[in-house]
Structures are given as C-alpha cells and as structure tokens.
Swiss-Prot record:
One of its GO terms (molecular function) is beta-tubulin binding. HEAT repeats lie at residues 368-406, 603-639, 757-793, 1111-1147. The gene is TBCD. Residues 1-23, 337-361 are annotated as: Disordered. This is Tubulin-specific chaperone D. InterPro entries: ARM-like, ARM-type_fold, TBCD, Tubulin_specific_chaperoneD_C. Residues 14-23 have a biased composition (Acidic residues). It comes from Bos taurus. One of its GO terms (cellular component) is cytosol.
Length: 1199
C-alpha cells in the first residue's frame, strides 16, 4: 500500500535534516513530468520484435532488457501514457509465450519484459488485457509443470503466470465443466479446481515475488461461487494450520506467514461478507495466537493489522453511518447544484436518530479495535498507517456512541507518557476519522489542542531528536480538517490553527515539516477562507520559499510578523521552544529571528519577553542557557537600534532591572564555574556575542566593574584557545575578537578618539607577549586581537604592534608548523592597515606611511614563499592565501588614498608573485590568486600605478571576457595564464608556477598546464631569440631552485616532457649548445648524492632527452647514464637500462655497427643482479660506444 496516497502521511520516522537545502530538488519538482506521449513506441516495437535474434547472445540479451527497463522507467510517474500501447506490446510478447516451438529461454525472456511493463503500469490495469477465455485456463495451468520454483533466474515467469491464472479464474463457468471424466480407468487425474489450488498453495510459501501473485490468485479463485462451497473451508484450514506451525523467528516461517497473511487479507477483502463471516472468528482467534505484534518483521506486523481490520469489517454490516458529518457531495455537479439552491445552508450530520443498536456489534469487534489501537503505536510507519486506515474504516460502521469511544481512545495516544510513534499514529488516525466525517464538530474542542501540541512535538533522544514525523502528520491532520469541515465549524479555532501552521512553516527545523505546514496552510486558506491574511502569507511562504531554513527564520518570519495576529505567537514560540533547542544552529537562528521580531512588537518584547530570557540565562540546562544569552544579546541590540531610530533613550525599553540583569549574566556564570568544560565553550561564545552587542548598543556601563570581568573573559578565551575543541575553536575565536573590538571602542575610550592609557598599555603588552607563546592557537587569538583594536588604541603603538606581528610570520625551526598563526598574523596586519589608514608623510607609529609601507609589503611578499607542509598537507597555502588577500587590500587602499607610495619595483614584484600563484597546481588557491591579480589589474578608482605591461595584460585579460572564467578549473585557467610567458616581466614567475603544475600528480592539472605550455612553445619555435630567452629563463628557474625538491622534482618532469616533444630541436643544430651544457650541469648537481628515487627517475628521463644534442655534451650524458646503470639501488639500474633502451630506439646516437650488440646487452642483462656482474656489462657498453669507463673512487681510510 503506497504511503504517498495522502500528503504528509508518509513522514520519515527518523529526523532527517537537510542543512544545505539547495535548489536541485526544487528544480526537479518545478520541471515536473514533461512527457506527453510514449515517444519510444517505434524503438520498443523493434526491440520486442528482435528478441529471438538476441536470444543466443547473452550480452545482447541483457542489453535489450536493460534498454527496455530504462525506457519504461521514464514513465513511472506517468504510466497512463503507456495505455494505448499496452495491447500491442502484450500481443507481441505473448506470441513468443504461446508459440509451442519457442525455446524456454525465449519464453522466460518474454515474461521478464512483461514483468517490467506490469511493474510500471501496475498489474491491476495490465492484467485486464491478458487473454482470459475458457480455452486459456488449461494452457496457462500446463505451463506451471515446466516451472522450477527454486530457479532464481526465472521468477518473473512464475509471477506473471500466477497473475495470468488469476485473470482466467474469473471466467463465468463452473470449473467442473472443464474436467471431463476424471475417473476413467488408468487415467485418474486431479480436477482443474484442485490443480489451481495446489499451484496457489505451493507458491504461497516461496521466497520470491511469486508469493505476492499467489495471494492475488487465491483471493480471486477461492471467492468464486463454485469454489467457495467446496474449497474455501479447506483452504482456510490449511492457512490457519500453516500460521500455527510457522514461527516468525525463522526465515522459512516468516516467508510462510507472509504469503498466508497476504492470501487471507485478500480473501477477506474480495470475498462476500456472508461467505467470510462464518470463518472470521476462527481466523481472528488464530491470528491472536500468532502474537504478530511481538515480531521484529515489519511486513508481518503490517499484514497482521491489515487482516485484523478486514476481519473487523467482516463482523460489521457494510453500511454508511447516518450520524457522520458531511461537507458537500462526492459528485462535483451535485455539490455545485446544492450550493446554488442553498447558498448559505451548511450540510451537517443527519438529525435522524442512529438506527444501529449496540446489540448489532459482535464482541469480537472490541478485540479488533484494541489491536488496531496497539498498531497505532507500532515502531514502523507502514504499520501505523495501516492501523489508522483500519480505525477510520471501522468507526464508519460503528454506532455513534461506540465510534466516539474509539475517538477517545485515539486521543489517549497523545499523553506525554506515550512515545513519538504513538503520537504519529494518533495523528494519522485523527486525520482518517476527520476526512471520513467520523470526527464530529463537538469533538473539535478536544482534538484541536492535541493537534496544536503535535505541531510542535519534539523530544531529545541522544545526540538528536525525534518528532519530525509527528509534526508532519499533524500538518496532514490540519490539511484533512480543511477539506472536511465547514468554515463555521472551525471558526473558533482559526486563530490557534493559523498561528500554529505559520510557526511550523517558518520555524520548524525539518524542511519536510515546513513544506507540509505550508501546504496545510494553503489548503486552509483555499477551503476555509477564514485564515487572517492567508493569501499574502501563502504567496510569500510557498513550497519553494520555505526550503531554505535561514530564509524562513530571518526573512519570511519578518514579513509574517508584520500581521499583528501572528507576531506575539511567533515570539512566544521562539522563546518557549527554539531558544533552548538542542541544535545550536536553531538557537542561533532563533536569537537572530527574535532580534527581527522585536522590531515588530518592542513593548511586548521589552516588558514580557526580555525578563523571561534573563531568567533563562541561569537555567541548569546548557542549551537553554546558551540560547537565552544569545537571545538577550540580539534583543538588546534590536531594542537599542529601534530606540535610536525613534530618537528615544534605550531606557524607554530596557529599565534599570533589565540593565542590571544584563550585567549580572557574566558574574553569575563565573561564580557557578560554567565557563569550564565543553559546556563552557558554548557559554564563552555566547557571552562574547553578548559583550559585542551590549557594547555596540552603547549601554551605559562605562566604568562599571563588569567591564573588567568581560575583559578577563576575552583575554582568558584568547589565551586558552588550544584547550577548546577544534570544531568550535574558530567560532569562539571570532566571537572573542569581535567582542574585544566593540568593548575597546565603547568602554576603553577615555573620550572620543582617545584610549584609556592603562587599558591600552595593559592590553597591547599582554597580546604582544602572547605572540611568542609556545601554543599556536594562543598566537592566533592574540594576533587577531591586535588586528581588531580600534585606531585610537594603536596610536603610538603601531610600530611595536607591526613588529610583533611580523615576528610571528617568520619561520623558525621551533614553529615551522604554525601556519595558522602566520595566517592570522597576516590577517591582523591587513586589518590594522585598514584601521589606521594611510598618510604618506604621517608618523610610522600612527598610520601607514612612506617610512613603513615597504616593510609591510616585504612581510606580505615574503609570506607568498611559504610552502610549509606537514601531516595536514600544504599548510603553507593558508598563509599564501592570506598574504594575497592582504596584499590586495593594502594595494587597493594605497591606490585610493596615496598611490605615490606604490613604487614600481614593489608593484612589479607583487604582480609577478601573483601571476606565479595563479599558475600553480592547487585549484582553490590558483583561483584566489587569479582573482586578486585581476582585481589589481582592473582597479580603476584610480588605477594601480606601475603595473608591468599593463596594455598587454588588458589585451590578454579584458574585463568583460574574464568575468565568467572559472579560474579553479585547470581547463580554463592554464591556457590563459600560459600567455604571460610572452611577457618578459612575468616569464620567470609564471614559468616557475607552471613547472610545478606540469610536473604535478593530478591528471587534469598536468594535462591542461602542459597544453598551455606547449601552445606557447609552438608559437616561438621559429623565433630563435625568443627560444633562447625562454631557455635562459628556464635554466635560471632551475638554478635558483637547486635541491629544492618542491620545485626541482616537478621541473625535471617538465624538462623531460619538453625534450621528448622536441621543444628545443632548434638547439640541436649547434654542437655543445650552452643551453644543454648548463642543463646537464644543473641535473648532475641536483642528483648528486641523492637517494630520492622519484628525483633519480626523473633525472634519467632528462639525461635520455639530452642525448639528442650533439658534441661533447652527448658523451658526458652517456657517461652519466652509465654511472646510473651501476647505481646502488637496483630499481634505478633497471629503470636506467629501460629508458636507455628506449633512447637508443628513439634517437640515432649509436653507430649501426654496434647497435644490435648494444640493444642485446641492455635487454638481456639482469640489471638488478649483483653490482660486479652489472658493472662488467656496463663497461662493455662503454667500450662499444667509446665512452671512458667510470673509475671506482677509493673511500678515504678511517683513522
């Protein structure tokens, strides 16, 4: 039974949250099903027609089946589009099935295709098209003789045959007429009726899907008029015996019980009441003895509930309760006609007395209803859903008084002693009763308060909570009530329901619940027409708008709060339910939402809400305490802002008691030692946010003792960041730094623009001292604290502060891994520059000026060379990223105010370093460097002076063209950055960056960086001067980075690529060209005494490439290779021999006379053998090629 038959009923049991609620799902829903017809008709016809041709080829057979499955799956949501085509598809496939000459494999394949069609369209619709004449019964039945129930490859055949047989069972003739004479001598055989029943019973206990089809067959067959008289009793007896001897604790028992329960449920559904009633009590008794509620098999419990409710319906006469509440008619025409004739007359329940006496209700009904009520509390949704439907169906046949008792029992599910499963089941049951008109208006006064509680139901369980399914189902109840009742019936509850639905729409944690509430609100607006401002709200809070949680809390809530009916309920909900929520994100959003809503109801917030929040700050519950402090901070700030806008003092909203309460928060937490431990982390962050907001609100606390307490908290937090858990460290650090900036600006100023001398001395001295702390996190916090100080606090101390921060950026052996400290020091330097501003001739102790600007630039540019790595990877990248950002901010600041301070050499170094970073291998940092580079190039207010080759850069990177470039994508970044190789000012640095990328490990980076480099090399192949310049630059990069493995190893790989691709072929015309001579010398120096296998392998490839250059250099290269043939590492010897062999094949460097012998030595020698053996073969190669034999150098004697 599908769970999606009604909105919101199939809510997930476990709380599922989608914090990153992106637009992917929304887009899919917005597009909807766009299909208009079965577009693959011709392809399908051809596919089905060629089944005999693909039968022999397993690959082709599986391909055809998969293709058909893909085609059909497209129509899962619009299966009706297949209806005009079902008949010809069925006929095509049945031709193979009914053809006596068809191979068994073809028959099985045809049934696989038939199953796929039935799965998509649904077997009830598809089966009608199967042939079901009298002549079809025996052939279908005979097909079962060839079936093996244990063959797991052909279960689709058995499934479809059972369904086909269930259709043929509907023929309107007695089966005995098909039997002929069963008792002829020597020809005794079973009757058709017995054969069908035997097939059905045998397949009810198999483990595959044929079991489901067998249950359908039984229900159609046993309920036939001729069969029920002879076989129903015996089949029910067999079923009850099967249930009795089966145990749900074994797999075989579960399978047998599943099939039997399905069959019984189908029989009591399709059979006539008078036929089933004599057996109902016995079946119920047997079912009770099976104790299915104790099973851990969800499906068995669901089938048990389904069977119980159908037994209950069998006990009761099939009648429509005259007492039920009705709104409108099922027929739209009748409903419209009635509304025209009686526009104001509501349709209510019949006034006639209930003619059904309680004596007509059998005593078994009580047991049935009791079991259904237990099913409402089951741990699985599908069981609760089935039980809820059963409750609704049963109540519809009960007398009014008994049905009201059932309603009362359902309401008992909503006590706080019950689990979330009971609440969910109760909601589903109430919805079923309401939509069937069985929940009379007189009961609404009891039901509505329960539903309002269910709309906010949430229980903490472990690290998360349960209840999202309850809230979802409660929305379903509201949706059902909107359709079930006339507006005047719900009018007394409109205010409460509308407020509750609005609250769920904007403030529920779960996106599914927000959307369900939005749908329920929309249904009520449309059906009831009495919800205040309904149209305005539902157009703003629609299905897609409520998909984003932050948007709901901060934007939509503000709009809805503009309607006074909803303002106070929303504020009340936030204070009561969300400020102390277990999810920290919800607490933070709730505090911000309260800040917004306080603007809508300032008097109520100040008079009622703020005192409650203050009392909650001392709660023993950590989450409540944390959320309350955050809320106090945000509300106080909001009320101050409002008072300022209205030209009133903040004391008009916050009286002296409230002010005192704000001041007492820190001291009370400190006295209770609540700043310690994991809970203390939350409270430190919250109080820091409180300090910031109170300071920004300019509360009159200057000179108060609380300021010292707040300052202690900030200092203690920054000094002990290393004791805070890593996942919350960043948030606490940011909160403390922001609090310090606000506190100093407001409460440490003696008068505007002048700091308290004692506070300035104490804080600056403290933070500068802590910059040398052995704890990295302490350095981070204090560096950022210095960066956050206001300008008047740095007055007279700027030189000292910058010197301290500069010292943090220097790498020493003891703090080489302190990359985060260096990053935060750079951020602090940048922020200080923005704070103090620029004055070209100003004092260096007060502003950025001519005297200190070059030193600041040197500090930042030096940090671009930070390539520190540790177990976390390239941590120096954090430093380089911060340095690039700081350089951009500083340069733009100088460009706006004092462009003359930007000197040409400095600007050239800056732009070249950025170009290098924009050519390197890490996507994220390459993209950041490119953005900074282009921001400086295209700055126009005014333009940055002295940018090297500005006209060429603007031509290569036009503003409009590069705006859409994804610099993080290697395919887009490297081809553009490689163009800078043509500009001499940038060539060195770009080549340095590209060399690292071309010789890297990431496939996409290597491919596109190589492609960009080779494109440039191709352009200069016919320009010897340009090639000479490029070669000189390349050698300079190599020379400057000798023994620097970060650059030299990838550079060797880059050189190998370039030599192998003929980038320097023009140099081969000259013997002993300076380029190759110097390159050989550099390579020898790089691998001298090296034990790095990767470096040695890369150098071998370069040596092999250098062989192409004629002259004395070739002999030296061969000598170097022959030295490596006797390297101590066997892997290097083997690798050298392999590459030399390829080199001999590639380049014509070996005389023809000795070529075969050289290749034979290289290929036949075991180069990983003992060194004396290898050395002899190496010397032989030296003799053949005329290269002097290397001589062993004796080790100096040890004295």
């Amino acid at each position: 039974m599908a769970l999606s038959e009604e909105p919101a009923a199939g809510a997930a049991e476990d709380p599922v949250e989608d914090p990153v609620e992106d637009a992917g799902e929304d887009a899919a829903l917005a597009c909807g099903a766009a299909l208009e017809s079965f577009g693959e008709s011709a392809e399908t016809r051809e596919l089905l027609g060629h089944l005999p041709a693909v039968l022999a080829d397993r690959s082709a057979r599986e391909g055809a089946l998969e293709r058909f499955r893909v085609i059909m799956d497209k129509y899962q949501e619009q299966p009706h589009l297949l209806d005009p085509h079902l008949e010809w598809m069925l006929n095509l496939l049945l031709e193979f099935v009914q053809n006596k000459t068809s191979p068994a494999d073809l028959v099985h394949l045809a049934f696989k295709f038939l199953y796929i069609i039935s799965k998509v369209r649904g077997y009830k619709t598809f089966l009608r098209l199967f042939p079901h004449e009298v002549a079809d019964v025996q052939p279908v039945l005979d097909m079962f003789t060839n079936q093996n129930p244990k063959d797991h490859e052909t279960w689709e055949t058995r499934y479809m045959l059972l369904l086909w047989l269930s259709v043929t069972c509907l023929i309107p003739f007695d089966f005995s007429r098909l039997d002929g004479n069963l008792s002829q001598p020597g020809q005794e055989r079973a009757s058709t009726m017995d054969r069908i029943l035997q097939v059905a019973e045998s397949y009810l206990v198999v483990s595959d899907k044929a079991r489901d089809a067998a249950a359908v067959l039984v229900s159609k067959f046993v309920t036939r008029p001729d069969v029920k008289q002879k076989k129903m009793a015996s089949f029910l007896d067999w079923s009850l015996c099967t249930l009795a001897r089966s145990s749900f604790q074994t797999i075989e028992g579960v399978i047998a019980m599943d099939g039997t329960l399905q069959a019984l449920a189908q029989i009591f559904k399709h059979g006539k009441r008078e036929d089933c009633l004599p057996y109902a009590a016995t079946v119920l008794q047997c079912l009770d003895s099976c104790r299915l509620p104790d099973s851990n098999q969800t499906l068995l419990r669901k089938l048990g509930v389904k069977l119980v409710q159908r037994l209950g319906l069998t006990f009761l006469k099939p009648q429509v309760a005259k007492w039920r509440y009705q709104r409108g008619c099922r027929s739209l025409a009748e409903s419209l006609q009635h509304s025209i004739q009686n526009p104001r007359e509501p349709v209510t329940q019949a006034e006639t007395p209930d003619s059904d006496g309680q004596d007509d209700v059998p005593e078994e009904v009580e047991s049935v209803i009791e079991q259904l009520l237990v099913g409402l509390k089951d741990k699985d949704t599908i069981v609760r859903w089935s039980a809820a439907k059963g409750i609704g169906r049963m109540a519809g046949r009960l007398p009014k008084e008994l049905a009201d008792d059932v309603t009362g029992s359902v309401l008992d599910c909503f006590s706080f002693q019950e689990t979330d499963s009971a609440w969910h089941g109760g909601c589903l049951a109430l919805a079923e009763l309401g939509r069937r008109g069985l929940l009379l208006p007189s009961r609404l006064s009891d039901v509505v308060p329960v539903i309002l509680r269910a709309l906010t139901y949430e229980e903490k369980r472990g690290a998360c909570s349960v209840g999202s399914n309850v809230r979802d189902a409660a929305c379903y109840v509201c949706w059902a009530f909107a359709r079930a009742y006339e507006p005047q019936e719900l009018k007394p509850f409109v205010a409460a329901i509308s407020s509750a639905l609005v609250i769920a729409t904007v403030f529920d944690r779960d996106v599914n619940c927000r959307r369900a509430a939005s749908a329920a609100f929309q249904e009520n607006v449309g059906r009831q027409g009495t919800f205040p401002h309904g149209i305005d709200i539902l157009t703003t809070a629609d299905y897609f708008a409520v998909g984003n949680r932050s948007n709901c809390f901060l934007v939509i809530s503000m709009f809805i709060a503009g309607f006074p009916e909803y303002t106070q309920p929303m504020i009340e909900h936030l204070v009561t339910m969300k400020v102390g929520h277990w999810d920290g994100t919800i607490r933070e959003l709730s505090a911000k939402a309260l800040r917004n809503l306080a603007q809508r109801a300032p008097e109520h917030t100040a008079r009622e809400v703020f005192p409650r929040l203050l009392s909650m700050t001392q709660s023993p519950d950590l989450h409540t305490r944390h959320g309350a402090v955050l809320a106090c901070a945000e509300v106080a700030r909001s009320l101050h802002t409002l008072a300022t806008q209205q030209g009133r003092p903040v004391s008009d909203f916050l009286d002296e008691k409230a002010m005192h309460g704000l001041k007492q928060i820190h001291q009370q937490l400190y006295d209770r030692q609540l700043y310690r431990g994991l809970g203390g982390e939350l409270m430190r962050q919250a109080v820091c946010i409180l300090i910031e907001n109170v300071a920004l609100s300019k509360m009159p606390f200057r000179g108060d003792a609380v300021i010292d307490g707040w300052q202690w908290l900030i200092n203690d937090t920054l000094k002990n960041l290393h004791l805070i858990s890593s996942h919350s460290r960043q948030h606490i650090k940011e909160a403390a730094v922001s609090a310090l900036a606000a506190l100093c600006s407001e409460y440490h100023a003696q008068e505007p623009g002048e700091a308290e001398a004692a506070a300035q001395e104490e804080l600056v001295k403290l933070y500068l001292a802590e910059l040398q702390s052995p704890e990295e996190m302490t350095r981070c916090g204090c560096a950022l604290a210095l960066g956050a100080l206001p300008a008047f606090f740095l007055k007279g101390r700027l030189r000292q502060v910058l010197a301290g921060l500069r010292a943090v950026t220097h790498i020493s052996p003891k703090d080489v891994s302190f990359a985060e400290a260096r990053r935060d020091a750079l951020k602090a330097i940048s922020r200080i520059c923005q704070t103090v501003g620029v004055r070209a001739e100003g004092p260096p102790d007060e502003a950025v000026c001519r005297e200190n600007v070059s030193q600041i630039y040197c500090t930042l540019l030096d940090c671009l060379k930070d390539y520190t790595t540790d177990s976390r990877g390239d941590v120096g990248a954090w430093v380089r990223e911060a340095a690039m950002t700081s350089l951009m901010d500083l340069t733009l600041l100088l460009g706006r105010n004092q462009p003359e301070l930007i000197e040409a050499p400095l600007c050239q170094q800056l732009m070249c370093c950025l170009a290098q970073q924009a050519s390197e291998k890490i996507d994220r940092f390459r993209a950041h460097a490119a953005r900074v580079f282009l921001a400086l190039l295209h700055a126009d207010s005014p333009a940055i002076p002295h940018v090297p080759a500005r006209p060429e850069l603007e031509r290569l990177f036009p503003r409009a063209a590069v705006a859409s470039v994804n610099w993080g994508a290697p395919s887009q970044a490297f081809p553009r950055m490689a163009r800078l190789l043509g500009l001499p000012a940038y060539r060195y640095h770009v080549l340095l960056g590209l060399a690292v990328s071309v010789g890297g490990l990431t496939e996409s980076t290597v491919r596109y960086s190589t492609q960009g480099l080779f494109e440039y090399m191709k352009e200069i192949q016919n320009d010897p001067a340009a090639l000479e310049d490029f070669g000189g630059t390349l050698l300079q990069v190599f020379e400057d980075n000798l023994l620097n493995d970060r650059v030299s190893v990838p550079l060797l790989k880059t050189l190998d690529q370039m030599l192998a691709n003929g980038c320097f072929d023009i140099f081969t015309a000259q013997e002993n060209h300076p380029f190759c001579v110097k390159l050989l010398a550099l390579c020898k120096e790089e691998i001298k005494k090296s034990k790095d296998v990767q470096k040695l392998r890369s150098s071998i490839a370069v040596f092999c490439g250098l062989v192409q250059f004629p002259g004395d250099v070739r002999r030296k290269v061969l000598l170097q290779l022959f030295l490596l043939l006797c390297h101590p590492f066997p892997v290097i010897r083997k690798n050298t021999a392999s590459q030399v062999y390829e080199m001999v094949l590639t380049y014509d460097v070996v005389p023809t006379a000795v070529l075969d012998e050289v290749m034979a030595v290289l290929s036949s020698t075991a180069w990983d053998a003992e060194l004396p053996v290898v050395r002899a073969q190496r010397n032989r190669l030296c003799d053949l090629l005329g290269v002097p034999r290397p001589q062993l150098v004796p080790k100096p004697a040890v004295r």
